[in-house]
C-alpha cells in the first residue's frame, strides 16, 4: 500500500510545476505535453493546463501509466503478428497475447481458454446476445433482458426481434434493481438467454448477479452479463456466480481503448455463432489479427486491478461519500438516483430539482461531467434509465453523473462540489419555478395550459 501511495504522490509531484499557474486543482493524473508542430492535434502546454479536471470516469478512464509502460515494447520493438508461427517475431507476440489472456482470466476466476479478445464491450455484447440466440434459434426463440441495459444490448435485442425472436424487457424497481420473481416469471420453455448488466453505467446500481446466475442455472438456460462497469472494480467470479458469458471493456478499467474481451464458458459448453468470417482467430469466435499492444494493455490493466481493487474501492468510497454529503448538506431538493446501498460508489447520479441539467453542465465548464451515458448523452431526451426507475421528466432532465476513479483526488472532489453548489444556487435564483416553491406554492397543484 505504501508503494502505491508513493507512486501516486510521485505522479502528482511530477506534474505540479506545470499546473501552478492554473486555478483548477491539480489532477490525479496528467501527461506531460512535449513541443509539437503548430497544426498538430496534440494540445499545447498552455491548452493542457486550461483543460477542465476530469470527473467522467464512467465514460472512460485515463490510461494507467503502468499500462502504457507494458504496452510500449509491443508498439516499438515486438511488432510481430501473433498468428505468425514460423519465426521469433510471431512467437514473441503470441506469448505476450497468451499472458494477457491469463491476466484477464485470473481477474474473473476463468480459464484462459474461455477468454476471447474483442474490440470492446459493444462487440462482446453483440457476440454474446446474437451469437447464442442464432445458434439455438431452431428450438429457442426467446430472450430476457432489462429496460436499463446499455444501448448496445437493447439494440442487439431489437435487431433479433426483426429476425423473428421474442424479447422480454424486464422493468426495474424504483431502486433500479430487478425483481427476481418477475425474472422467474418471464422465463419461458424456449428461452435461450438472460442478459442483465452487473453495474449500471448511468446510476451505478449493482444487480444481484449471483442470484440471477442461480436462477438461470436451475432453469438450464444461459446467463450473460455486461460487466464493463464492474470488472476490476468489484470482486467477480464467473464460477461462483454461475455466469456463462461476460463482456469486458479495456478503457473502463484504466486500459487502452479499442480492446475488450468476452468470457464464454467451456464446461458445460456454451455454443455461440460467430458474427464475422475470416482467418478463424480466437477459436473462430472473432476472426482478425489480434492487436498485441492493446491486449497486452488490457492484461496489464486487469492485473493491476486485481492487485489494487480493495485499495481503490475503499478510497473511491470515501471520496464518493465526501461528495454526496457536502452537496446534500449545502443544497436542498437534491435526489440521488438508484439504490444507495446496492451501488458502486464511483458512479453517482444526482438530480438537482429546478435546474436544467444541460445548463448546469455548461456552467460547470471547469469540470468534465456528463448527464448520463456517453453513448446517448448527445440526445436531448431524458435518460431512459431514469425514466425506467420512475423518475419524473423534470428531475430526469436535471440529472448529472459524477465519476470518481483511481486518479481522482480529494482536492478535485472539493473543487467540483464548490462549483456545483455555486452554480445550482445561481441557476435556481433565475428559475421562476424555484421562486414559486420558495413562496410555498405546490407546483403539482397548478394546472398548466399551452399557448
Curated annotation (Swiss-Prot):
Activity control: Active only in complex with LYRM4.
Gene3D superfamilies (UniProt xref): Aspartate Aminotransferase, domain 1 (3.90.1150.10), Type I PLP-dependent aspartate aminotransferase-like (Major domain) (3.40.640.10)
SUPFAM superfamilies: PLP-dependent transferases
Positions of [2Fe-2S] cluster binding: 375
Family assignment from sequence similarity: Belongs to the class-V pyridoxal-phosphate-dependent aminotransferase family. NifS/IscS subfamily.
A Pfam family assignment: Aminotran_5
Name of this protein: Cysteine desulfurase
Residues that coordinate or bind pyridoxal 5'-phosphate: 121-122, 229, 249, 251, 289
Active site: 375 (cysteine persulfide intermediate)
Molecular functions per Gene Ontology: cysteine desulfurase activity; iron-sulfur cluster binding; metal ion binding; protein homodimerization activity; pyridoxal phosphate binding
Coiled coil: none
Keyword Iron carried by entry: yes
Enzyme Commission designation: 2.8.1.7
Class in the EC hierarchy, top level: transferase
Sites of Cysteine persulfide modification: 375
Biological process annotations from GO: [2Fe-2S] cluster assembly; [4Fe-4S] cluster assembly; iron-sulfur cluster assembly; Mo-molybdopterin cofactor biosynthetic process
Record PTM N6-(pyridoxal phosphate)lysine, positions in chain: 252
Cellular component, GO annotation: centrosome; cytoplasm; cytosol; mitochondrial [2Fe-2S] assembly complex; mitochondrial matrix; mitochondrion; nucleus
Alphabetical list of InterPro entries matching this protein: Aminotrans_V_dom (IPR000192), Aminotrans_V_PyrdxlP_BS (IPR020578), Cys_deSase_IscS (IPR010240), Cysteine_dSase (IPR016454), PyrdxlP-dep_Trfase (IPR015424), PyrdxlP-dep_Trfase_major (IPR015421), PyrdxlP-dep_Trfase_small (IPR015422)
Residues annotated as binding Zn(2+): 375
Cofactor(s) listed: pyridoxal 5'-phosphate
Keywords: Cytoplasm, Cytoskeleton, Iron, Iron-sulfur, Metal-binding, Mitochondrion, Molybdenum cofactor biosynthesis, Nucleus, Pyridoxal phosphate, Transferase, Transit peptide, Zinc
Organism whose genome encodes this protein: Rattus norvegicus (Rat)
Keyword match Oxidoreductase: no
Amino acid at each position: 500500500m505504501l508503494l502505491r501511495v508513493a507512486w501516486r504522490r510521485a505522479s502528482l509531484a511530477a506534474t505540479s510545476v506545470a499546473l501552478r499557474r492554473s486555478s483548477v486543482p491539480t489532477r490525479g493524473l496528467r501527461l506531460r505535453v512535449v513541443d509539437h508542430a503548430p497544426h498538430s492535434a496534440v494540445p499545447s502546454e498552455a491548452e493542457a493546463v486550461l483543460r477542465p479536471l476530469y470527473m467522467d470516469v464512467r465514460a472512460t478512464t485515463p490510461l494507467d501509466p503502468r499500462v502504457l509502460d507494458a504496452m510500449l515494447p509491443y508498439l516499438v520493438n515486438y511488432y510481430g503478428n501473433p498468428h505468425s508461427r514460423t519465426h521469433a517475431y510471431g512467437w514473441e507476440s503470441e506469448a505476450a497475447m497468451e499472458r494477457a489472456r491469463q491476466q484477464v482470466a485470473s481477474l474473473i476466476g476463468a480459464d484462459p481458454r474461455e477468454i476471447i479478445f474483442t474490440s470492446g464491450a459493444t462487440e462482446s455484447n453483440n457476440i454474446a446476445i446474437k451469437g447464442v440466440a442464432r445458434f439455438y434459434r431452431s428450438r429457442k426463440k426467446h430472450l430476457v433482458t432489462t429496460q436499463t441495459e446499455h444501448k448496445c444490448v437493447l439494440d442487439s435485442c431489437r435487431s433479433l426481434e426483426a429476425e423473428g425472436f421474442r424479447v422480454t424487457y424486464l422493468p426495474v424497481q424504483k431502486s433500479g434493481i430487478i425483481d427476481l420473481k418477475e425474472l422467474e416469471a418471464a422465463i419461458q420453455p424456449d428461452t435461450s438467454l438472460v442478459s442483465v448488466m452487473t453495474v449500471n453505467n448511468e446510476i451505478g446500481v449493482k444487480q444481484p448477479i449471483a442470484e440471477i446466475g442461480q436462477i438461470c442455472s436451475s432453469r438450464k438456460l444461459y446467463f450473460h452479463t455486461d460487466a464493463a462497469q464492474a470488472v476490476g472494480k468489484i470482486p467477480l467470479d464467473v464460477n461462483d456466480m454461475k455466469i456463462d458469458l461476460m463482456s469486458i471493456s479495456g478503457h473502463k478499467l484504466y486500459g487502452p481503448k479499442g480492446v475488450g474481451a468476452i468470457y464464454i464458458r467451456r464446461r458445460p459448453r456454451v455454443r455461440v455463432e460467430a458474427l464475422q468470417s475470416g482467418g478463424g482467430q480466437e477459436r473462430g469466435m472473432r476472426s482478425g489479427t489480434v492487436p498485441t499492444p492493446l491486449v497486452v494493455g488490457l492484461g496489464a490493466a486487469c492485473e493491476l486491478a486485481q492487485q489494487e481493487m480493495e485499495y481503490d474501492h475503499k478510497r473511491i468510497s470515501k471520496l464518493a461519500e465526501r461528495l454526496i454529503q457536502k452537496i446534500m448538506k449545502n443544497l436542498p431538493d437534491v435526489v440521488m438516483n438508484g439504490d444507495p446501498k446496492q451501488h458502486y460508489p464511483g458512479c453517482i447520479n444526482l438530480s438537482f430539482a429546478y435546474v436544467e441539467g444541460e445548463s448546469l453542465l455548461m456552467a460547470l465548464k471547469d469540470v468534465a461531467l456528463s448527464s448520463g451515458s456517453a453513448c446517448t448523452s448527445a440526445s436531448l431526451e431524458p435518460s431512459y434509465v431514469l425514466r425506467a426507475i420512475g423518475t419524473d421528466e423534470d428531475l430526469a432532465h436535471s440529472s448529472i453523473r459524477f465519476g470518481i476513479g483511481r486518479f481522482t483526488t480529494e482536492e478535485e472532489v472539493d473543487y467540483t462540489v464548490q462549483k456545483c453548489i455555486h452554480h445550482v444556487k445561481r441557476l435556481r435564483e433565475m428559475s421562476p419555478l424555484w421562486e414559486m416553491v420558495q413562496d410555498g406554492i405546490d407546483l403539482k397543484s397548478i394546472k398548466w395550459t399551452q399557448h
